[in-house]
Amino acid sequence: MACKTCCSKIPCFRQKKTVLVTGAAGLTGNMVYKKLKERSDLFVARGLVRSEGSKKKIGGHDDVFIGDVMDPKSLAPAMKGIDALVILTSAVPKIKPGSGPNTGKRAEDVIDSSFQGPMPEFYFEEGQYPEQVDWIGQKNQIDAAKAAGVKHIVLVGSMGGCDPNHFLNSLGNGNILVWKRKSEQYLADSGVPYTIIRAGGLENKAGGRELLVGKNDELLPTEAGYISRADVAEACVQAVQFEEVTKFKAFDLGSKPEGTGTPTKDFKALFSLVTARF
């Protein structure tokens, strides 16, 4: 089919975007990686993981690179030639031994809106503290992407950054939201076109809810302060696809409770509601 805007009979093809997802072995990162691969008519997917074991865990495909976000040089091969970067690396608190029945498990596998009972104690593994992963590691990714000429960076953060006393900062004494906010500001000041998605409380449930955007943690104390990982992953993919309405924007992302509202289908319209740059 010829392009309607020219006289040529040569077919017009939409150029695929090459998109790298870091943290591709994580719960949300892997969802984004898989969604990109499923839409091979629009995207060429790449993933970045920390180890050979993590690569095998998600299929061991040639489009999965191994790199350490604390080692900027190791990021260059994965960044080469990409159009967009989706940052989904994050420090992961784990439950302290002897602190409840889920000893050793990651907080994200246990704690969500349905959690009941006394809150256990948490810790971060050596070398995996929020200052290292959510600040220095994300800064390294932003710098590497900028050096590689990346045209768009989507950074997934968290709601709660406006409150220094938010309970997430107390987990393992990591101040995780403080460091996340610092990397968000660094990205906003980097000069690289960006989209910052501050997700609400993450739930390990099916997606397809009605999504809501906000700012300054206004959704956090409401019933819209939670969102499924699947919906966050979908928002990341859509943010890359509709970059014309997501670049240089930052927003909170929540959802109506499960079983209520109308599932969001028009992401371009949703993103067009956002006016905040940070």
Located regions from the model:
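NAD(P)H-binding glycine-rich loop region in Rossmannoid oxidoreductase-like domains
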Residues: 19, 30, 47-148
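Substrate-positioning beta->alpha
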Residues: 137-138, 179, 197, 221-238
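Conserved beta-loop-beta element that borders a ligand/cofactor-binding pocket
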Residues: 152, 156-173, 182-211, 218-221, ...
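Alpha-helical substrate-binding/gating segment
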Residues: 228-250, 254-258, 262-278
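Non-catalytic, hydrophobic alpha-helical segments
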Residues: 85, 187, 197, 232-236, ...
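A short helix->loop->beta-strand "cap" motif at the edges of active sites that frequently abuts
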Residues: 41-43, 146-152, 181
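N-terminal chloroplast transit peptides
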Residues: 1-15
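N-terminal Rossmann NAD(P)H-binding glycine-rich loop of SDR-like oxidoreductase domains
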Residues: 13-42
